[in-house]
Amino acid sequence: MQDTSGTQPIQTDALVIGAGPAGLFQVFQLGLQGIRCHVVDALPHVGGQCAQLYGDKPIYDIPGIPVCTGHELVQLLQRQVAPMDAQLHLSQQVSQLQRMDDGRWLAQTTHGLELHARSVFIAAGVGAFVPKALKVPGVELLAAGQLHYHPADLEMVRGQTAIVHGGDEEAVAAAIACADRAQATYLLYRRDAFQASAVLLERLQELRDSGAIRVVIGQITQLHADAGQLRAVQWMDGEGQEHELAAQQLVVCLGISPRLGPVAEWGLAMERKQLLVNPATQATDAPGIYAIGDIVSYPGKHKLILCGFHEATMAAFAAAEYLQGEKPLLQYTTTSARLHAILGVSHPQA
C-alpha cells in the first residue's frame, strides 16, 4: 500500500474509510473483484484500534491463526493486501461526504484532499482515533511546528531542546528517539513509572543514567511563547510548586481516544451512533455506500474482527454488482487464473 497525496481531485472506483483489520480486508476483497481503491485513516499508520490498543496483546479467535498480537495481525493483513496496490492517505479524516450530480460521492479530507468515488466503504470502527490534546494556557499562542502529537518522525527536534510529555510506550519510545537527535531531552510525566516494554524501559534507564534523558516528575500547567515560538514549559511538582523548563519542541503522547466525528453528519441512517445496514450486502440507505465492522448495526451483529472480515466480503460482492451492473461470478483463489494474476501468483512451467 502506498501513501500518496495531491491537489487534484482523485477519481476512484472505491474509497475505504478506515484502515483497521476490517478496512484492510475490504481492500483485499475489492481487489479480488478487480476494484481499485483509496484508503483514508486518521492515524499515522494502518491497523486502527487493533494496532493502537491491542498491538502487543494476544488475539486467539482469528481462523487459522491460533494466536497472534494485534501488530502481527496487521502485518499479515498488509502482506495480504499488498498486491491490490491501494493508495493510502494517513493522518487525515474524511470531513465531508456528499452525493455528486452524476451519482458518485465527493469526499473531502482534513488535509484538503478531494476524492470522487463511485462507491464508499465505511470501516471506521468505534470512530476515528485522535490524539488527546494538551489543554493548558499558552497552547493557542504557538505557531505550527513546535507542538507535536504522536509524531511518526522526530527529525524536527535535531539540535534543539525537546520535552516529551507522557508515560506510555509511545512517550518512552519518543524520548529515546529524541535523545539521538536533540541537544537536550526531557521526559515529563506525573509519576516516575512508565508503561512500556521491558526492552524500552531498560534503554530508558541507560539513557537516564548517562544523562541523555532527564526525567521530570510533574504536570504541565502553561506554555510560554515569544512571537509564536515556544520558549518554556511551566510545570508543577507534587508539592504544588511551579517551575519553568526552557524548550523549543514539545512532543505530547497522552494517548488517543475514538470520536465518531463527521460520520454522524453525512445523512446516513444511524441508531445509537452506529450505521444501519442490510446484512446481506452491508449497504447503507445511501446508494453506493457500504459499512462494515464495529461502526455498523444489524440484527445479530457481533463486534468481532472475524465478523468484520465476513462483512467486507459481502460488501465487496454487493459493490461489484452495483458498479458492474451484474452479479459477479464466484471464483476461488485456489483455482482461478484471473485471481492468481491479481494476487501475483506464478505457476512454474511443467
Curated annotation (Swiss-Prot):
Alphabetic keyword roster: FAD, Flavoprotein, NADP, Oxidoreductase
InterPro entries for this protein: FAD/NAD-bd_sf, FAD/NAD-binding_dom, Fd--NADP_Rdtase_type_2, Ferredoxin-NADP_redctase_2
Cofactor binding note from Swiss-Prot or TrEMBL: Binds 1 FAD per subunit.
Catalyzed reaction equations: 2 reduced [2Fe-2S]-[ferredoxin] + NADP(+) + H(+) = 2 oxidized [2Fe-2S]-[ferredoxin] + NADPH
A Pfam family matched in the record: Pyr_redox_2
Transmembrane portions of the chain: none
Residues given in the record as FAD binding sites: D41, Q49, Y54, V94, F129, D294, T335
Region forming the signal peptide: none
Gene3D superfamilies in the record: FAD/NAD(P)-binding domain
Superkingdom of source: Bacteria
Cofactor entry: FAD
EC number: 1.18.1.2
Subunit structure: Homodimer.
Family note: Belongs to the ferredoxin--NADP reductase type 2 family.
PANTHER family in the cross-refs: THIOREDOXIN REDUCTASE 1-RELATED-RELATED (PTHR48105)
UniProt xrefs under HAMAP family: FENR2
Protein name as it appears in the record: Ferredoxin--NADP reductase
Organism per entry: Delftia acidovorans (strain DSM 14801 / SPH-1)
